[in-house]
Structure formats: structure tokens, C-alpha cells
């Protein structure tokens, strides 16, 4: 999942029309560097303190012939990101990127690119544990709302708008339901989830006339801040102060009050450009990350978790029968799978979820999940897809066979006939043929 998130943000960065402005901030250059493939990073570092162009042939000496494909991928990425400039023979490092990246590494300049820490002590003690708890509660409020947890809190208006705009939920405002894309979102690690929403936020910023480069600068700045340290609001631009209010709703930053002149980045923010994947301070402490689901051949499911979020997700495709302090027992049935399918969740997504969260005890099984269960879930999906709903109008109660046959022939000529039964003197047409058919029957009645 981490590779997917890196691919998405890199794709967005490649499409930016003006990279010169993006690379004017040291924090942005550092963040972009962290998002590059490993070999691309190596090439950047090898040229960083060398102002002279390097011949393409010289790079060939650094790698084995069998690794040529990786070199090509790295070069293409660096050129598309406008970090490398290639004239067909020599490669030069972007001068602005070089300058600002060196500043980021050496700590020089007076640019406030990495935020301005508050010098006075906060009267209200804010600890790392508090920030972790705040971020976890705020982010899981969004996830609980998506899966429809009973009595779940409503996220802010900005979050609701983004969930719908990004296709993660659909329906009227007071009846939003998770979509197939939304369930896929739940399968991602925490960092990929956050970047999914932030990329939608970046696209939305263009519609609201916010500068996407300034938005990126602020996100990259957050990724370079220190967890547990307070930073001043006064040095932020107008765009960044608007963003600060929005990002509070995602749990990326904490402010005691809206008018507070200081803010604290949470672990969700400081991990934006790293491989951070958990809401917990130590990833190893999260049992859910290790796998907690056991599935039997009789379709019974045992989930060793106390997480309300994971229990709610399982409830999307299984009937829960019993719940204990750290164990939930359920069963996967035709009705529970059909319910999930009706919500837009695919069979493959359910199987992926069960595989991803399989208990270590199941890891020795080959295949990991019972084949009978996997096959049955796919069969239930095929059963649903075999039935197709077509909106239209049913015509019936014809007095004679000839009148019925002539009406059916007319519907066929129009190309709107869906179904007919001469035995019952009934036929069904699409809505597009309703008006012509009604007019035809009226003409017949006049005769």
C-alpha cells in the first residue's frame, strides 16, 4: 500500500505546471527527495555537490548491466519531476532544487520553511501521548462514519464534502454510504489513507482558487516538523492558515482553540513523507497490524480484536453472532455478502481484507483462506451480477392476442422491448419508449 501512495503523490507532482516554485522551499525539496525511489535518491546525492554536468555514459559505470532497467526508471522519474535536466548527452541537476536541498541538509538560511517553533512555554501541557490520542480519535471518527458504526460522531463539513467528492461515499448528505472505492480506502495503511484525502484536497484547492503550490509547501512542511513541539501560526501565509483549520478536522494538527497562536503537528502529519503506517506510537504494539482473523471452512469467522473500527468493518460483510472483550464471532452468509455487494463492495476486496488481516496461525495454511469460502464468495458475486435491473414500464391487460402481438411488434421496431409474455399478454419496455408506445396505443383505441 505504501508504494501505491508514493505513486499517487508522485503522479500529482509530475503534473504540476510550475516546478520552479515548488522547489523554492527547502522543506519541499527534502520531502520530494524522500518520495523518490532509492536509486533516484542515490543519483541526486551523487550530483548534489558537483555543479558540473555529468555524461550519461558515466552513470552506466555505476550499475550492473542487469540493473539497466532500474536506471532508466530512475532517470525518467527525475526528468519528469524536473530535478534532472537532460540535453541528450549530459545530465544537470536543477539549480534551484540543488540550492534549496543543500539548505535543507545543512540548516542554512532564514526561510521558515521548517516552521517557526514557539519560544514561550505553553501553559496547557501538550504531550506526545496526548497528541497520539487526539490524532487517533479524530482520524477514527472519519473511519467509523464511513463504515456506519452506530452512534458514530459526524466529521466536519469539509471532511464530508471531501469523502463524497473523492467517491469514497455516495448518496444524500444525511444518508451517505460507503462505496467500493471507500472500502478499498479502508484496506490501505494509514499513510496511504491520509494521502488519498489530501490529494482530493489538493484537487479541491484548485477549484477554490487556493494556490496548489502553497498547499503542497505546507503539507511538506508538516512532514518535516518535530512531534510534540509547538509552532507559531503568525508566520503562516493566509492560505496556510485556512489549511490549518481544515487539517484539524483530519487530526493532522492540534490547536487548543481556533484563535490559538500555536499549533502542534500530530504523528499523522510528521509521518507524511515517511513509511509511517500506524496510529500508534509503536507499530509493534498494534495487534491488529499483525493479523487477527481466523476463518473456518464452515464460513465461521473469529476476530481477535477489541477495535470498534475493525469490528464495524467486519460487520459490513459478515453477520456478527457474539462479542467478548477481545473476540468477535461471526459467520459469512449469502445474505451478508449480498448486503456488502449492494453497498458496492467487491468480492475481491472482501477476500483481500481477510487475507491481509489473517491471524498468524493461518499463515501456515496453503492456500491461506479455505478455497470453499473463497469460491463461494465469488459465486455469490456472480449470482448478483447475473441479475440486471432495467427501469421501464409494464403493459398488460390486453383484450385480444392480435392487439397484444401488434403492440409487441411496434415495441420491437422502436428497439425498446425488454421482455414479453404472450401467455400473460404482458410486455415490458424501457422508459425511453414509454411516450411513443402510449401514443401508439391511443391511436389504436381511437380506431
From Swiss-Prot:
Primary location class: nucleus
A single GO cellular-component term on record: nucleotide-excision repair factor 3 complex
UniProt KW keywords: DNA damage, DNA repair, Nucleus, Transcription, Transcription regulation
Record's keyword annotation contains Transferase: no
Xref: Gene3D superfamilies: 3.30.70.2610
GO biological-process terms attached to the record: nucleotide-excision repair; transcription initiation at RNA polymerase II promoter
GO MF term set: ATPase activator activity; double-stranded DNA binding; RNA polymerase II general transcription initiation factor activity
UniProt keyword GTP-binding, yes or no: no
Matching InterPro entries: Tfb2_C (IPR040662), TFIIH_p52/Tfb2 (IPR004598)
Signal peptide: none
Subcellular localization: Nucleus
Family the entry assigns: Belongs to the TFB2 family.
The protein's role, per its UniProt record: Component of the general transcription and DNA repair factor IIH (TFIIH) core complex, which is involved in general and transcription-coupled nucleotide excision repair (NER) of damaged DNA and, when complexed to TFIIK, in RNA transcription by RNA polymerase II. In NER, TFIIH acts by opening DNA around the lesion to allow the excision of the damaged oligonucleotide and its replacement by a new DNA fragment. In transcription, TFIIH has an essential role in transcription initiation.
Subunit comment: Component of the 7-subunit TFIIH core complex composed of XPB/ptr8, XPD/rad15, ssl1, tfb1, tfb2, tfb4 and tfb5, which is active in NER. The core complex associates with the 3-subunit CTD-kinase module TFIIK composed of mcs2/cyclin H, mcs6/cdk7 and pmh1/tfb3 to form the 10-subunit holoenzyme (holo-TFIIH) active in transcription.
NCBIfam families, per database record: tfb2
The name this protein goes by in its record: General transcription and DNA repair factor IIH subunit tfb2
